[in-house]
Design a protein with these regions (language model features):
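N-terminal secretory signal peptides
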Residues: 1-16
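C-terminal catalytic histidine-bearing segment of alpha/beta-hydrolase fold enzymes
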Residues: 246-291
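Short beta-strand element of the alpha/beta-hydrolase
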Residues: 77-85
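N-terminal cap/lid segment of alpha/beta-hydrolase-fold proteins
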Residues: 40-72
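Short beta-strand/loop motif that positions the catalytic acidic residue
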Residues: 213, 219-221
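N-terminal export leaders
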Residues: 16-31
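Primarily recognizes the serine-hydrolase "nucleophile elbow" in alpha/beta-hydrolase
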Residues: 147-209
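Gly/Ser-rich "nucleophile elbow"/oxyanion-hole loop immediately N-terminal to the catalytic nucleophile
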Residues: 123-165
Length: 291
């Protein structure tokens, strides 16, 4: 199984760079390469009433940029770490942070590819993957999420109320993080890869970790996903039933006829009904677990 078919539906038409301006080069390059145009369904969540923007987070090797959004002037907030697709913390990911902030969360999306490069500079998928995404070790990414969680706890987040959600590439990481951080209370993985060929940088996949899960995960998948067969999802369900207590408490929802990237409202892959239902389920999943 390759990730190319998964990624095709997620190509972003535009991105806000780290200073908040529109980076049109990536949009032009990706659109030219794929023939896709921006979907009119793209959601734009306003930042009024929120503290939203770039922050710098102490991490291994220096500072890591991140986007954060929270209700303005509030503290003691439940925290959600938002884990990006291969395109970094572009406008869609930032908008998800603002949506979560409007639900009362401190949402933090760390730039976990900052050491490898800026995804906004790339105009073709193969080069982006080879030079940035595939060079980011799981261990580094999980450490960066730990750094983001620590930063959040000292900047308005409530201790003991931590969740994570990830999309596509980040969906796989969300599963891994649920096995990594004992302080995580819940996670939601949107169409994250469940099986794959291990290598030095990616030694395990979610299906390998069912005995190690420390937090229950809500998996959100589509039956028409070209890169993640329903057979893989069903295999994960079966493995969970024999895994740790957190694995047995996890759940997977499969949306009929939904493709990969069905939550990506800026792409033709967007399926509003499935996206809205998945978001509702995610919020309830977090709330039911004290986040």
């Amino acid at each position: 199984m390759t990730q190319d078919s998964q990624i095709d539906s997620l190509l972003p038409p535009l991105r806000l760079n780290r200073r908040g301006f529109i980076a049109t080069a990536v949009a032009t390059g990706f659109t030219a390469a794929t023939g896709h145009a921006a979907a009119p369904t793209a959601i734009r969540t306003p930042a009024d009433g929120l503290d939203a923007g770039e922050v710098r987070i102490p991490a291994e090797g220096g500072e890591m940029p991140a986007y954060r959004a929270a209700p303005q002037g509030k503290t003691g907030l439940p925290t959600v770490l938002v884990i990006n697709e291969i395109f970094g913390v572009h406008e869609y990911i930032q908008d998800l942070c603002r949506r979560l902030a409007r639900e009362g969360y401190l949402a933090v999306a760390p730039e976990v590819f900052a050491r490898q490069g800026d995804p906004a500079r790339y105009t073709d998928i193969a080069t982006l993957r080879a030079e940035v995404v595939d060079k980011a070790p799981d261990a580094q990414v999980l450490g960066d999420l730990d750094a983001a969680a620590k930063w959040a706890a000292g900047n308005g987040g409530a201790a003991g109320r931590l969740a994570a959600t990830g999309f596509c590439w980040g969906g796989r990481i969300a599963w891994l993080y649920a096995a990594h951080n004992p302080e995580l209370k819940a996670a939601a993985a949107w169409y994250g890869q469940l099986r794959g060929k291990p290598d030095a940088l990616r030694p395990v996949y979610p299906i390998d970790l069912v005995n190690d899960l420390r937090a229950p995960v809500l998996g959100l998948y589509g039956s028409a996903d070209a890169g993640i067969p329903v057979a893989d999802v069903e295999a994960m369900r079966k493995a969970q039933a024999q895994g740790s207590s957190a694995a047995r408490a996890s759940a997977i929802e499969i949306y009929q006829d939904a493709p990969h990237g069905f939550h990506a409202d800026y792409r033709p892959s967007y399926r509003e009904e499935a996206a809205r239902d998945g978001w509702r389920r995610m919020l309830a999943w977090f709330a039911d677990r004290g986040v």
